[in-house]
């Protein structure tokens, strides 16, 4: 974080902003190559970003209802951290759908073209989490990959003073003891995998909507397998917990991911059949 007088510039916001602009440019180039008019896309993308952020914050708030019922104004303080990528995809996707229904803008080509940008956003967000220190904390672990934060890394101690919520106190205490799963890096790896996969899906593209639904499918799977089991998040369905290895099942994200996987498979099959019937 860089402090300029009363203004705090956080790595998280800087990196996400860069990812948005780069993703926007990649989408424009892809749509131009496909022969689509760019003007409608340029109109809708601003609102897609706005409602993507709203959806991301709302998704995070819904996973911690107790805290935000007691502190409702905190739901507006997005700079305090806490965004859900599932919520971002939903908010942005619904915005594209609204403009599709109201103004006839293309839906699936726009969503397909946006997938590399979303992947970049995941990578940027997780690197920002790492720079902030206290975000997306990992569970304690005895595995060799466990990481102990050095004393000079002030991100975690900085969030501990003055905390009233007992779960946050526990989170701070756990992180200070270490070693922990470095889940910020796990999440960035998920984003990188999705970036390369999305570029492959766009080249393959047997039909419009293919890249988008493949993205939703594999984001849900990869995050549920490679990141969520190791994060210090409450278990909505406490099916399995190993405090020695630092593994827990199932978090809210994992629970939400299952219907998204099923929906993605259904939509891929449906859109694929529609394309086959037109041939």
From Swiss-Prot:
Amino-acid positions noted as binding a 1,2-diacyl-sn-glycero-3-phospho-(1'-sn-glycerol) in the UniProt annotation, renumbered to this chain: 126
Give one GO biological process term. Answer: lipoprotein biosynthetic process
| Major localization class | membrane
Taxonomically, the superkingdom here is: Bacteria
**Keyword line:** Cell inner membrane, Cell membrane, Membrane, Transferase, Transmembrane, Transmembrane helix
Q: In which pathway does it act?
A: Protein modification; lipoprotein biosynthesis (diacylglyceryl transfer)
Relate the protein's function as given in its record.
Catalyzes the transfer of the diacylglyceryl group from phosphatidylglycerol to the sulfhydryl group of the N-terminal cysteine of a prolipoprotein, the first step in the formation of mature lipoproteins.
Which PANTHER family does the UniProt record give?
PHOSPHATIDYLGLYCEROL--PROLIPOPROTEIN DIACYLGLYCERYL TRANSFERASE, PROLIPOPROTEIN DIACYLGLYCERYL TRANSFERASE
| Protein name (record) | Phosphatidylglycerol--prolipoprotein diacylglyceryl transferase
* The organism of origin for this protein: Thermus thermophilus (strain ATCC 27634 / DSM 579 / HB8)
């Amino acid at each position: 974080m860089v402090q300029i007088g009363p203004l705090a510039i956080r790595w998280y916001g800087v990196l996400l902003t860069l990812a948005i602009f780069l993703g926007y440019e990649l989408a424009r180039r892809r749509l131009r190559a496909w022969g689509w008019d760019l003007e409608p896309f340029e109109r809708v993308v601003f609102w897609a970003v706005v409602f993507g952020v709203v959806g991301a914050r709302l998704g995070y708030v819904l996973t911690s209802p107790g805290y935000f019922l007691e502190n409702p104004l905190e739901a507006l303080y997005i700079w305090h951290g806490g965004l859900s990528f599932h919520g971002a995809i939903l908010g942005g996707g619904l915005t594209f759908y609204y403009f599709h229904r109201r103004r006839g803008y293309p839906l699936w080509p726009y969503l397909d073209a946006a997938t590399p940008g979303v992947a970049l956003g995941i990578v940027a967000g997780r690197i920002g989490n790492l720079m902030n220190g206290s975000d997306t904390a990992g569970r304690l672990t005895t595995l060799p990959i466990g990481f102990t934060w050095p004393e000079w890394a002030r991100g975690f101690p900085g969030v501990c003073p003055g905390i009233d919520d007992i779960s946050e106190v526990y989170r701070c205490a756990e992180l200070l003891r270490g070693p922990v799963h470095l889940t910020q890096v796990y999440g960035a790896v998920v984003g990188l995998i999705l970036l390369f996969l999305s570029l492959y899906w766009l080249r393959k593209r047997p039909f419009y909507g293919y890249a988008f639904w493949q993205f939703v499918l594999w984001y849900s799977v990869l995050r549920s397998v490679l990141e969520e089991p190791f994060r210090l998040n409450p278990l909505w369905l406490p099916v399995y917990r190993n405090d020695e290895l630092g593994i827990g099942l199932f978090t809210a994200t994992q629970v939400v991911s299952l219907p998204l996987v099923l929906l993605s498979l259904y939509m891929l099959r449906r859109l694929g059949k529609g394309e086959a019937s037109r041939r």
